[in-house]
UniProtKB/Swiss-Prot annotation:
This is Cytochrome c-type biogenesis protein CcmE. Its main location: membrane. It is a single-pass type II membrane protein. GO terms for cellular component: plasma membrane. One of its GO terms (molecular function) is heme binding. The keyword Zinc does not apply. Heme binds at H123, Y127. Residues 1-7 are cytoplasmic. Residues 29-148 are periplasmic. Belongs to the CcmE/CycJ family.
Length: 148
């Protein structure tokens, strides 16, 4: 092979390898990407049914109900505008309380119940996940606009 052909072969191989690597990385990102939705967005059918995503807001007061098995918990997540029922089987975080911030990851069933695989609770009095805080602010502004 001439030096010029070798150089072209190396460039072509490099471009092909870079393309394959890019496809693999994008595929990995796509399969691990988890979107965040507020209860209002879920209630407005903006969230995918049967696909994993996160929902965040406040645990509605008086909504936490433990099942007889001791590990399944039903509760409601709200952004002060809409409410979504959540079912979680597992041990809840110590800081999980009614009226406090929560982010749950799982799938929305066709019956409208969010089946959580993981529940994350607010960890101090001043912290709320940015997505949940933004969703609460947006829902509160919308509610105030409607009331005027």
């Amino acid at each position: 092979m001439k030096p010029r052909h070798k150089k072209l072969a190396i460039i072509a191989s490099s471009v092909t390898a870079l393309g394959v690597a890019s496809v693999l990385v994008l595929n990995a990102f796509q399969s691990n990407l988890v979107f965040f939705f507020s209860p209002t967005q879920v209630a407005n059918n903006e969230a995918p049914v049967g696909k994993s995503f996160r929902i965040g807001g406040l645990v509605e007061e008086g909504s936490v109900k433990r099942q007889a098995d001791g590990v399944t918990v039903n509760f409601l997540v709200t952004d002060t505008a809409k409410v979504i029922p959540v079912v979680y089987t597992g041990i809840l975080p110590d800081l999980f309380k009614e009226g406090k911030g929560v982010v749950a990851q799982g799938k929305l069933a066709s019956d409208g119940i969010f089946r959580a695989d993981e529940v994350l609770a607010k960890h101090d009095e001043n912290y709320m996940p940015p997505e949940a805080a933004g969703a609460l602010d947006q829902a509160d502004k919308a509610r105030k606009t409607v009331m005027q």
